[in-house]
């Protein structure tokens, strides 16, 4: 997870989340717990499931944080 200005990580939909409290170059093995609520409504027609993504971005192939807590380049999916 990348850091912007040492206080936030690049989240989903190219928006910055609160993924980290500071830029640490070494591996940080601290425990983080998050909950995700999923609601699936099934009807008579075709079913469509929608899942909310967690606010995390990968360094390669995901978001990279630029200046002022903005994502650069914006390549989130």
From Swiss-Prot:
Intrachain S-S bonds: none
Top-level taxon in the UniProt lineage: Eukaryota
Protein's UniProt keywords contain Cell membrane: no
Coiled-coil regions listed in the entry: none
Pfam families per record: Metallothio_2
A single GO molecular function term of this UniProt record: metal ion binding
Swiss-Prot/TrEMBL keywords: Metal-binding, Metal-thiolate cluster
PANTHER family, per database record: METALLOTHIONEIN-LIKE PROTEIN 2A, METALLOTHIONEIN-LIKE PROTEIN 2B
Homology family: Belongs to the metallothionein superfamily. Type 15 family.
Function of the molecule: Metallothioneins have a high content of cysteine residues that bind various heavy metals.
Protein name: Metallothionein-like protein 2
Biological source species: Trifolium repens (Creeping white clover)
Lineage: Eukaryota, Viridiplantae, Streptophyta, Embryophyta, Tracheophyta
Gene: MT1A
